[in-house]
Amino acid sequence: MNILIIGATSGIGYGLWQHYSTSGNRVAVMGRRKAELDVMARTAPDHTVASVCDIADTGSFDVAFDHIVGELGTLDLVIVCAGIGELNPELNIVTELTTVGVNVTGWTNCIDRVYRQFSEQGRGHLVTVTSVGGLQPTPVAPSYSASKAYQINYTKSLQAKSKGTGIFVTEIRPGLVDTRMAKGEGLFWVMPLDKVTRAIIRAIDRKRPRLIVTRRWRVLNYLLKHFM
């Protein structure tokens, strides 16, 4: 397969690159950290195409995306992991607007460009990584929880839009994962990255429309959705 992972230099995206780049696929990776991307390209040179890109810069993303399509020809699977999350109890406006710029504006441009590419191809599998945090207001990170609620509903809209086409859309909705984005002391139910990555790979292989990972977070997801 020809695969693109957006937000691949750490966390879930990096774990997915490790799997797919060692499974006979050609994997394009995008991220902000050039040093990490260079290491990835050197580690699996025959299976990795790297492109430095910050999705908040929509023009830069469009150029990088067109370059990737030119390199790979077609895209079979695109996984969008890019995003930021900062604790912001003081409501620092720079933090709030930066979060919106990445998780809403940049993310939407990214998703839209991928979906249009799949429409041109007549097929493709889009995977978004949202968060259980999008189901409940978060006083210490209001912009983050609001942005994840946006992503959840945008993904649902694309799932409805893609019915009857060759495009399939999967939403991955994790709880707290042991990555750079999990911030704070004594975090509740933090999940090991390798366990989460394996579950995501299975869901993608089976083309599940949605995965709430792991099981304990599925219970919390149900409670938040129906009783909060």
Q: Which residues are covered by each model-predicted region?
A:
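Conserved glycine-rich cofactor-binding loop
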Residues: T9-S10
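Conserved glycine-rich Rossmann-like NAD(P)H-binding loop of the short-chain dehydrogenase/reductase
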Residues: N25-M40
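Conserved NAD(P)H cofactor-binding loop of Rossmann-fold oxidoreductase domains
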Residues: C81-L87
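Short alpha-helical oligomerization interface
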Residues: N88-G101
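Active-site helix of classical SDR
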Residues: I111, S147
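Residue(s) in the substrate-gating loop at a strand-loop-helix junction
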Residues: S131
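C-terminal helical subdomain
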Residues: E171, K183-Y222
